[in-house]
Amino acid sequence: MKKIFRKIHLWLSVPFGLIITLVCFSGAILVFENEVNEWFRRDLYYVETVKESPLPMDKLLEKVATTLPDSVSVTGVSISSDPGRAYQVSLSKPRRASLYVDQYTGEVKGKSERSGFFMFMFRMHRWLLDSMNPGNEGIFWGKMIVGVSTLLLVFVLISGLVIWWPRTRKALKNSLKITATKGWRRFWYDLHVAGGMYALIFLLAMALTGLTWSFPWYRTAFYKVFGVEVQQRAAQGHEQKSDAQKRDTKLAAHREKKREGNEVRKGERSRRPENNHSDMYSVTSPFVYWQEIYDKLRRQNPEYKQISISSGTASVSFNRFGNQRASDRYSFNTDNGEFTETSLYQHQDKSGKIRGWIYSVHVGNWGGMFTRILTFIAALLGAALPLTGYYLWIKRLIKVRK
């Protein structure tokens, strides 16, 4: 039986080993992307001086809006519990665009964008640097190759476990040692065998979750195992697009109204009492109730990690183990700021949780910094396994030929 599994292990590993190395290594680099970015770009992510209180939300966002082209609008804001961290302001376009803003001065600190190095690593990890054809036509070869390699990695890991399985307790103890004093060949052998066993659970978790991004059929089957039906992306996209169009129409109307009222305000400013604060921010601003919403949620959730607000919706996330994308969700009336619906995470359907769990397990942040470090080490071992395997295989071939 083990002889069959040895052949499976070898002949699945040889053609795809280098790809697995690239995918695992790039994945390891991405584990601490946020920390590295914040270390090198602290001026972008953090404010220079923490003051007693930030600017009112409507005034802050209106100030940001004046720096944007007419075709771009503010769609949301994310506020950290850390008073020294800059607000992240979401924009209508391009997709997922956002700015970091000093909430105490209104200064736009810069764009939120992936560095060239980490974008390179991400494209390597997901698509082997390939790009999808315009119009999504044809086969996305990079994505396909990564998916097939990841699927085969699952069988390689399982076959490796069968080959490794010791018969005695003494053999188990010896098979989990890595010896560095008996020559390079013994070291690479121990690293391949023992290192593979130490990383096995994490590598399997990363592979099984990662496949949900590669193959729709696998994603459907994976979801069904947990009793969840895959939501139709097309319907979701249409609904989101419709909501976005409504929001942009409302914001465009606000911009036009503000533009038309500029001359009137200029004429009235000289007659307005000095203590009258009823300017363009107080009534016409689409952000007029956002500060009130934030204050309510902050009082209700003193241990929050981040509060995000957009037109008619808000969410609160926490520093907890488990699904790192978990959040309590709220809907509110944009005309009076009253909450209309509350959806606490614990009461949400499985369909609203599983994607966050998949991501959290895949990147290893479900257990905080400890599991992230273990995931990083496991991914590096995953990158080393094919290389040590090639070394041992070539050594064996040379020995046989002699």
Region spans (language model):
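Conserved histidines in hydrophobic membrane contexts and catalytic metal-binding motifs
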Residues: 1-402
